[in-house]
Amino acid sequence: QFNHFDPSFLEETNDAAAQMSNAGVSMLDLRSNVGGYEEVAHQWINRYSHQRVFSTGVRYSVLPASLVASPSTSKTPRASNDNILILLSGKCSASCAEITLDLSYNLDNSLIIGENTNGSMISNSGHIELPNSKCSVDMTFSTVYLTPDGSDYFEELRGFFPDIWVPAKEAETLA
């Protein structure tokens, strides 16, 4: 079970990825992972797959307006992978855990089992109250996550769809 992408455990995280990459079938439990440091997620999947794995989406910085990662005009390349990687997802899988799932969409032989994720890819959000309506909203002070046109595999507040939807409590047993 991987609950947080914490940079202080980067070495242990990378060691676990290397160990899992040698197994024919591995399972990464992200059901209670609320996010963390994005670089840890990228390093984990790259270490697991022994290659660079690309995300389909792109992060766009709102202050100042600029792309954090350049959008590709061509199709995102798939990363080959001979082993099976099962990722467990749930409603608490958020932020950086969702980035890991996005990366896994481009990794051969990966399978996401569980529930839709949290749908919170906006980075560094803050709670504000609108002055006239007094409605409470969360807004990002950093970046938003954009998916390719026509793509419906992720949406803010709805999350990522798993490949196989099962109740999160049962995902590990049914995997």
Go through the PLM ranges and name each one.
Residues 35-84, 122-134, 141-145, 156-157:
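Gly/Ser/Thr-rich loop/hinge elements
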Residues 1, 19-36, 86-88:
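Short acidic catalytic loops
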Residues 84-106, 111-120:
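Extended C-terminal subregions enriched in glycine
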Residues 10-17, 41-45, 85, 97-101, ...:
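Extracytoplasmic/secreted envelope proteins and their assembly/folding machinery
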Residues 30-31, 55-61, 113-116:
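Surface-exposed patches in mature extracellular/periplasmic domains of secreted proteins
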Residues 112-172:
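BRCT (BRCA1 C-terminal) domain core and associated BRCT-interaction motifs
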Residues 1-9:
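STAS-typified acidic loop motif
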Residues 21-26, 51-54, 80-85, 107-111:
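Loop/turn elements at helix/coil->beta-strand transitions in domains of secreted/extracellular proteins
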